[in-house]
């Protein structure tokens, strides 16, 4: 079992990081950041509006983080050379996405390629917080597994949400059928990502959410780290920073290793790994980077199918073997299926049920998927709930230290505070994929609307403490052009977990993803198209 940062390779001291990019340069209030890979990377930027001052009864001034180098000392000619070399490296090494202006770029490989939006140089991140995030990852992995086994907890916690959220209701129906059949998942695989921000007000590393399905960018995030290491080896002396402070990021390798071990546990050498994908996916190269490791390192056949194709081509045999297109499936790896848009018809829901009824290893199972929901995360933050699943008091304290404030809308006092000071809260629906959160005065308006409509609608949302990170000046590169912005970053730490009955085979921190957006944007309406990938520079 891996713990701490041991699963990443270091040279002396190292670092890992990632960033997000926008086209506006006006600094303003920041927000916690949940970015959909398919939206924030591939849509055209729009001009951002300055945000209104927070109506919090106090003046909040965002603090700028001390840069690891002085951008003003880098002349334009030097920066242009860095950008040129970065774009060449990206093109040669596959740090690319599909260009939305090309019609076939989402389903025909090699058509309409462009470099992924990137931070030109890595972002400073305190080493102590980096180690904290690494150290708790195996604990969160174990927590997810234990929660997933408590079917009553999942059903009870989400029972009210089921009444107001059709998507969650359909997932719960599948879960309920598995409980009725007493269906056991002897082999359980989770490829997770835990997202954090550094809160300037409390000087704490606070978790934004746990992601248990379709955790994107293990491939591209690894490449961004390698890109930054390459640039710093060439230009670090001139800039005044050391490439050895950027940690080696092995996210794709470790995810592929976990998938391969799950495939081995299934014990059918002729079976394949099936990746569930969207019909159009301009982030396909991130997915193919992982698939290529499975083929080349582990000699495993990988197939890609949409849920509609699984329903059309799939069946479950008497021994519960999943057959798709005439091939037995050992592992089902979801890179789709996390939003209602991924289930436009009954065909997709039939496929989800078919997969769940089979003996294939699911990544994630329906129980793991539900465990990652916003409501379950809010329930876990309640006093005494972690103790239901974990015994070690020190481990529980480590996890609780990462929790931001999370509340049900049944808490009338918190709702009152959020109406009075909406800038201190984020309102989150039961949705994955980004672009759904509610900020600022919209929090007040939605809470007042729900009060008029009655309490039933409350179950569709939770309230979270709004996190205010420090701001960094950064060069952000999109479509071959760099811009300087004040930006904020979000650290995602990957975790891999594999269990076969009573044996834990894998439980480790598995690399990282850094994303950044400009400080003036909220998520909703402006986050799409304003993100870049980045890496960490440990300080």
Swiss-Prot record:
Tell me, in one coarse class, where this protein mainly resides: plastid
Tell me the superkingdom of the source.
Eukaryota
GO annotation, biological process: glutathione biosynthetic process; response to jasmonic acid
* Positions contributing to ATP binding: 209, 374, 428-437, 439, 464-467, 490, 517, 523
Q: Where does substrate bind?
A: 193, 213-216, 281-283, 287, 335-338, 515, 526-527
Cell compartment(s), UniProt: Plastid, Chloroplast
CDD domains on file: eu-GS
Q: Would the keyword Glycosyltransferase be found if you checked this record's keyword annotation?
A: no
On assembly, the entry states: Homodimer.
Similarity comment: family membership: Belongs to the eukaryotic GSH synthase family.
- What's the protein name? Glutathione synthetase, chloroplastic
Q: Which organism is it from?
A: Arabidopsis thaliana (Mouse-ear cress)
Per the record, the gene is: GSH2
């Amino acid at each position: 079992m891996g713990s701490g940062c041991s699963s990443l390779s270091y040279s002396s001291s190292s670092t890992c990081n990632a960033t997000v990019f926008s086209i506006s340069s006006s600094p303003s209030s920041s927000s916690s950041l949940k970015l959909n890979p398919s939206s924030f990377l591939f849509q055209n930027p729009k001009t951002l509006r300055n945000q209104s001052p927070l109506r919090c009864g106090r003046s909040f001034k965002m603090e700028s983080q001390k840069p690891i180098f002085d951008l003003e000392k880098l002349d334009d000619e030097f920066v242009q050379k860095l950008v040129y070399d970065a774009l060449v490296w990206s093109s040669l090494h596959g740090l690319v996405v599909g260009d939305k202006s090309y019609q076939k770029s989402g389903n025909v490989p090699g058509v309409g390629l462009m470099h992924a939006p990137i931070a030109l140089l890595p972002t400073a991140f305190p080493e102590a917080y980096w180690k904290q995030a690494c150290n708790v990852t195996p604990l969160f992995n174990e927590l997810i597994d234990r929660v997933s086994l408590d079917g009553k907890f999942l059903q009870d916690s989400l029972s009210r949400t089921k009444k107001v959220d059709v998507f969650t209701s359909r997932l719960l129906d599948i879960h309920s059928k598995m409980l009725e059949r007493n269906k056991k998942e002897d082999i359980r695989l989770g490829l997770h990502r835990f997202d954090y921000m550094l809160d300037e007000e409390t000087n704490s590393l606070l978790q934004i959410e746990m992601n248990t399905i379709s955790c994107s960018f293990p491939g591209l995030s690894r490449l961004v780290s390698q890109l930054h290491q390459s640039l710093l080896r060439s230009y670090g002396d001139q800039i005044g920073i050391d490439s050895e402070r950027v940690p080696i990021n092995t996210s794709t390798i470790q995810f592929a290793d976990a998938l391969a071990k799950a495939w081995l546990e299934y014990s059918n050498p002729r079976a394949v790994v099936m990746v569930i994908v969207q019909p159009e996916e301009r982030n396909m190269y991130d997915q193919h980077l992982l698939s290529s490791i499975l083929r080349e390192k582990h000699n495993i056949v990988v197939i890609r199918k949409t849920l509609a194709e699984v329903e059309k081509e799939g069946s479950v045999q008497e021994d519960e073997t999943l057959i798709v297109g005439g091939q037995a499936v050992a592992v089902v790896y979801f890179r789709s299926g996390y939003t209602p848009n991924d289930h436009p018809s009954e065909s997709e829901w039939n496929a989800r049920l078919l997969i769940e009824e089979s003996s294939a290893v699911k990544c994630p199972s329906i129980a793991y998927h539900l465990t990652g929901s916003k409501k379950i995360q809010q329930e876990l933050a309640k006093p005494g709930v972690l103790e239901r699943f974990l015994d070690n008091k020190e481990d529980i304290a480590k996890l609780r230290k990462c929790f931001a404030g999370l509340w049900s809308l049944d808490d009338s006092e918190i709702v009152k505070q959020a109406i009075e000071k909406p800038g201190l809260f984020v309102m989150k629906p039961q949705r994955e994929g980004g672009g759904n959160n509610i900020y600022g005065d919209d929090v007040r308006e939605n809470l007042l609307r729900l009060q008029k409509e009655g309490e039933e609608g409350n179950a569709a949302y939770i309230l979270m403490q709004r996190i205010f990170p420090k701001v960094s000046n950064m060069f952000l590169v999109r479509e071959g052009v760099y811009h300087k912005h004040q930006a904020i970053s979000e650290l995602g730490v990957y975790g891999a977990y594999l269990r076969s009955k009573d044996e834990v085979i894998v439980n480790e921190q598995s690399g990282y993803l850094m994303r950044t957006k400009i400080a003036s944007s909220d998520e909703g309406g402006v986050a799409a198209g304003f993100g870049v990938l980045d890496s960490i520079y440990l300080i």
